[in-house]
From Swiss-Prot:
It comes from Arabidopsis thaliana. The gene is ATE1. The keyword Acyltransferase applies. Residues 1-18, 285-296 have a biased composition (Polar residues). Coiled coil: none annotated. Keywords: Acyltransferase, Plant defense, Transferase, Ubl conjugation pathway. Involved in the post-translational conjugation of arginine to the N-terminal aspartate or glutamate of a protein. This arginylation is required for degradation of the protein via the ubiquitin pathway. Component of the N-end rule pathway with ATE2 and PRT6. The N-end rule pathway regulates seed after-ripening, seedling sugar sensitivity, seedling lipid breakdown, and abscisic acid (ABA) sensitivity of germination. The end-rule pathway regulates various aspects of leaf and shoot development. Involved in the oxygen-dependent N-arginylation of RAP2-12, an activator of hypoxic gene expression. Residues 113-122, 298-310, 564-578 have a biased composition (Basic and acidic residues). The lineage of its organism: Eukaryota, Viridiplantae, Streptophyta, Embryophyta, Tracheophyta. Pfam families: ATE_C, ATE_N. This is Arginyl-tRNA--protein transferase 1.
Length: 632
């Protein structure tokens, strides 16, 4: 989905700047998840003065996470509630029926057809409510409509898949391409976007050309000689959609619809008035609904009486902007934290909000016009969701070279019935899919941390097929492979599971080794100290109207670690922890530690070297030699 974007207008992100960090060492704190009174949450902490998006990408692929300018990573074998980094390859995403229902529910609300009110307006007069009998009748009719629509979308998806296969057999697409499954979506809206001819209207749409374009570009960049590189360079999403259109005509007629392409999207249209097509999602644009905006005094309940058959229309806009303080966002954040998480007023003041969700060490990278940076650039962003101008949700995200990383989401408690946490995640996944055609390295959606014993985090694994990061070898392991062992104990060397179950082929297909064998990799967790009050919930909290997993948190007993001296994060590929090449910052100058060793007193070396050894273990050799370790 395309987003309105002024993101590249603020911050002058010089690409020549480097990462500068301060080391806080090992930290112990109380845990916001299991609520243990002991200081059982164990992590390593860093503060970043500045941080390149490339270094942060490497850090989160080693298990780190940021909260404001603070970076943290759990000692997975020792901490009470081990958090595993979880991610999803966006082009492989298959929405569940529940996730599809969330999208449809919001569309019905935008059309004024959802029989629901915000919390602040409930409990007034029930005289205008639809009777139980009529509600059941309407529900049954809607269910029948949805079945018919889903059957049509399934048929159209199969037609597209056949067209893709035809293009592969004809040599237009590479034969070794990983083929994403075609997804066709219903187009919803009251103001239908008419095409040039007659009264044809968009009923369904597919963005399959975007992941195909990204897959072809990945093949061309990974193979030295390339495959049809001269031709492939012209395979933009627009070109691919035209090729698929031609192939679909060869496959056979699609009854009751005509097919046209627009800006890379394959649109299915009808000249007949369709009882299921009275709503609209406009591809390649902001979600826009509307015509009659609501003022704050009006009810959000849809009018269904005989005097007003025309449902009130609402307009949804999604707006991406660089991270900065916005008083309106802060007010929404306060309402969310106080009502949803029962925070104390002293915990939601402006200074803590800035520190948690506005301040970012990431050095902005502006769009350069090439295929290495998306149109919005890289850095930290706030994504606003507005209905008729009213701010209802804000997603805090980091856009990095390989992923969109979800940091936090807060929303208007009056709109809890819209399941905005799930809806925003779906929009962010779609954003990755559409932008990877322009930036092929941008493939993944990171959902932060996953704690198997925390029921509020179970929803993250519902975005399938998801992967968890192994805390020892730092390979990505399919969640379904890891789940049986996580059911038994909280700390697991995930890559061992795949090997022991003879699932190497599955692991090779779904996983990616993120570093060379001799390098050390690591795991992530939420901030251990300054923001412990935020650790009781997930990065992007489950909506309160959604049921948690049936399993209670009865597996909170922590797996025993072997000894205080054991440390799983030691580099398995190195015999010692060579700190000579760590890059040190001192009074504005930079040195390798080996250049400083002779001028430091024995007492100073005794204090500093254990810190450097621990630092090198948790960030790895490569980053320790690239990021500046500040000493004041």
């Amino acid at each position: 989905m395309s987003l309105k974007n002024d993101a590249s207008s603020s911050h002058d992100g010089g690409s020549n700047r480097e990462s500068v960090i301060d080391d806080h060492g090992r930290r112990k704190s109380t845990c916001g998840y299991c609520k243990s009174p002991a200081r059982s949450s164990i992590s390593h902490g860093l503060s970043a003065q500045t941080l390149t998006v490339y270094d942060y990408q490497a850090l989160i692929d080693r298990g780190w996470r940021r909260s404001g300018t603070y970076l943290y990573k759990h000692e997975m074998d020792k901490t009470c509630c081990p958090p595993y980094t979880i991610r999803l390859k966006a082009s492989d995403f298959v929405p569940t029926k529940e996730q599809q229902r969330v999208s449809r529910r919001l569309e019905r609300f935008l059309d004024g057809k959802l029989d629901v009110q915000p919390r602040e307006q409930r409990g007034a007069s029930s005289s205008g409510d639809v009777s139980d009998t009529r509600r059941k009748t309407l529900g049954a009719a809607k269910s029948e409509e949805n079945k018919k629509v889903e059957a049509v979308m399934d048929d159209l998806s199969k037609n597209i898949d056949q067209a893709v296969q035809l293009c592969i057999r004809s040599g237009e697409f590479p034969s070794n391409m990983q083929i994403p499954k075609a997804s066709v979506k219903k187009v919803f809206c009251a103001r239908r976007k008419k095409l040039a001819e007659g009264t044809e209207q968009i009923l369904y749409t597919s963005n399959i050309a975007f992941p195909i374009a990204a897959a072809i570009k990945r093949i061309q960049t990974s193979e030295k000689e390339g495959i049809n590189s001269a031709e492939g360079n012209r395979l933009s999403p627009e070109t691919i959609s035209e090729m698929l259109l031609s192939a679909m005509h060869k496959v056979g007629e699609t009854p009751d619809v005509s097919i046209k392409v627009c800006k890379g999207h394959i649109n299915f249209l009808s000249s007949a008035k369709d009882s299921f097509s009275d709503r609209d999602v406009v591809p390649n644009g902001n979600i826009s609904r509307g015509a009659n905006s609501l003022d704050g005094s009006e009810t959000l309940h849809a009018k269904k009486d005989s005097e007003n058959h025309q449902a009130r229309k609402r307009k949804l806009e999604i707006h991406l902007k660089r991270s900065s303080f916005d008083p309106e966002e802060h007010e929404l954040y306060k309402r969310y934290q106080l009502k949803v998480h029962n925070d104390k007023p002293g915990h939601v003041v402006e200074s803590s909000y800035r520190r948690f969700l506005v301040d970012s060490p990431l050095i902005d990278v502006q769009p350069s016009g090439d295929e290495k940076v998306p149109p919005c650039g890289f850095g930290s962003f706030h994504q606003q969701y507005r209905i008729d101008g009213r701010l209802i949700a804000v997603g805090v995200v980091d856009i990095l070279p390989k992923c969109l990383s979800s940091v936090y989401l807060f929303w208007d408690p009056d709109y809890a019935f819209l399941s905005l946490g799930k809806y925003s995640a779906i929009q962010e996944i779609n954003w990755v899919i559409e932008n990877q055609a322009r930036c092929p390295s941008l493939q993944y959606y990171y959902l932060g941390y996953y704690i198997h014993s925390c029921s509020k985090m179970r929803y993250k694994a519902a975005y399938r097929p998801s992967e968890l990061l192994c805390p020892l070898r730092f390979q990505w392991v399919p969640f379904e492979v890891a789940r049986p062992m996580l059911d038994k104990k909280p700390y697991v060397i995930l890559s061992d599971i795949a090997i022991s179950h003879n699932q190497c082929s599955l692991l090779a297909g779904a996983s990616e080794t993120l570093v060379e064998p001799a390098a050390s990799e690591h795991e992530d967790m939420e901030q251990g100290e300054t923001n412990d009050n935020f650790m009781g919930c997930s990065d992007e909290d489950e909506d309160e109207d959604e049921d948690d997993d049936d399993d209670d948190d009865d597996d909170e007993e922590m797996y025993e670690t072997e000894s205080e001296d054991s440390h799983i994060e030691s580099d398995p590929g190195s015999k010692d922890n060579d700190i000579n090449n760590i890059l040190i910052g001192l009074y504005g100058s930079q040195y390798r530690y080996k250049e400083m060793r002779q001028i430091i007193t024995p007492v100073g070396r005794k204090q500093l070297e254990p810190m450097l050894q621990s630092y090198r273990k948790v960030v790895g050799a490569e980053l320790s030699e690239r990021m500046v370790y500040e000493i004041n």
